[in-house]
């Protein structure tokens, strides 16, 4: 099992915000949904848009390129739940957001 890796300080991600980070060399999007942190692949399955640059509305992120939307808590596409982006385990320790990749 892989280790949890520091992604950023919890204070850098305000509620309702999403951000792009690199974790263990992989592009990851982090989301603060009402104080809970979620992590997904940063790549939209439609055309590869950067989800961390999208708009977060509750638990749903809207891809900035073509408006595909994803539930960040499950990775499911809101129009077709059979389509899923990878999600990653997250924990917050000592004010740091840690993500487990692969």
Give residue spans per PLM region.
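Absolute protein N-terminus
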Residues: 1-2, 102
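Short amphipathic
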Residues: 3-10
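Rieske [2Fe-2S] iron-sulfur-binding domain
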Residues: 12-102
């Amino acid at each position: 099992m892989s280790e949890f890796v520091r992604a950023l300080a919890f204070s850098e991600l305000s509620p309702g915000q999403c951000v792009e980070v690199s974790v263990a060399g992989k592009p990851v999007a982090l989301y603060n949904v009402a104080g809970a942190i979620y992590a997904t692949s940063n790549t939209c399955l439609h055309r590869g848009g950067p989800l961390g640059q999208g708009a977060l509305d509750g638990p749903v992120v809207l891809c900035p390129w073509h408006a595909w939307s994803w539930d960040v808590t499950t990775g499911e596409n809101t129009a077709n739940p059979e389509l899923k982006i990878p999600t990653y385990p997250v924990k917050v320790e000592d004010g740091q957001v840690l993500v487990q990749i692969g």
